[in-house]
UniProtKB/Swiss-Prot annotation:
GO MF: ATP binding; glutaminase activity; phosphoribosylformylglycinamidine synthase activity
Record protein name field: Phosphoribosylformylglycinamidine synthase subunit PurQ
Keyword Ribosomal protein attributed: no
Primary gene name: purQ
Function as written in the Swiss-Prot or TrEMBL entry: Part of the phosphoribosylformylglycinamidine synthase complex involved in the purines biosynthetic pathway. Catalyzes the ATP-dependent conversion of formylglycinamide ribonucleotide (FGAR) and glutamine to yield formylglycinamidine ribonucleotide (FGAM) and glutamate. The FGAM synthase complex is composed of three subunits. PurQ produces an ammonia molecule by converting glutamine to glutamate. PurL transfers the ammonia molecule to FGAR to form FGAM in an ATP-dependent manner.
NCBIfam families according to UniProt: FGAM_synth_I, PRK03619.1
Length: 227
């Protein structure tokens, strides 16, 4: 399986993503610069964390207009897996692949720590190797991670089982309904503020993020068999 790691000016978690795919799960991964216009040959897209375009105007607002974005939209429409982490999640909301928005943390400070997450939906292509309700430990590092949506959108997310991860015990940023990660209605686009790519080795704090990437590979291989 081959992953595309999209690089924007200001990305800083792209190397972590590449390491997680190549070294931790042994799959192929390549950088794709934001000015490219093709994702031919790739099976999954990863939008990494960081500060794309310096977070000017608004987080993800300028990245929305990158040349690669129409191809990311087309990729998602084909049902292929797209994962946006932290700034990547912010970009996914900006381009309309996911509902809602990420706003300033309610304490107005940058937060960098490991937090407990509850797996709220273990039936997606990103979470099938987790147990429903399982508590995992994954780092967060953001200043605008406070997920917001209106009441109608929140109700729809709940009814469609689109809330994949929630903060457990402590909500670090004020997100509505403790939301840490959501999928689109089709289930092939996941946006999350915590960084699973930083939780793939015991030596740096744990491996609870590893199964997310392994789940994607498992789902992809099953699809190839059934194709």
């Amino acid at each position: 399986m081959k992953f595309a790691v999209i690089q924007f000016p200001g990305s800083n978690c792209d190397l972590d993503m590449l390491h997680a795919i190549r070294d931790s799960i042994g799959e192929e991964a390549e950088y794709v610069w934001h000015a490219e216009t093709s994702l031919a040959g790739f099976d999954a897209v990863l939008l990494p964390g960081g500060f794309s375009y310096g977070d000017y105007l608004r987080t993800g607002a300028i990245a929305k207009f990158s040349s690669i974005m129409p191809e990311v939209l087309r990729f998602a429409e084909m049902g292929k897996p797209v994962l946006g982490v932290c700034n990547g999640f912010q970009i996914l909301t900006e381009i309309g692949l996911l509902p809602g928005a990420l706003i300033r943390n309610n304490n107005l400070h940058f937060i960098c720590k490991t937090v407990p997450l509850r797996v709220a939906n273990a039936s997606t292509m990103f979470t099938e190797l987790y147990e429903e309700g399982e508590i995992i430990q994954v780092p967060v590092a953001h200043g605008e991670g406070n997920y917001y949506c209106d009441d109608e959108t929140l109700l729809k997310l709940k009814e469609n089982n689109q809330i994949v991860f929630t903060y457990d015990s402590v909500n670090p940023n004020g997100s509505r309904a403790d939301i840490a990660g959501i999928v689109n209605e089709r289930g092939n686009v996941l946006g999350m503020m915590p960084h699973p790519e930083r939780a793939v080795e015991e030596i740096i704090g744990g491996t609870d993020g590893l199964r997310l990437f392994e789940s994607v590979v498992k789902a992809w291989k099953e699809e190839q068999v059934n194709a």
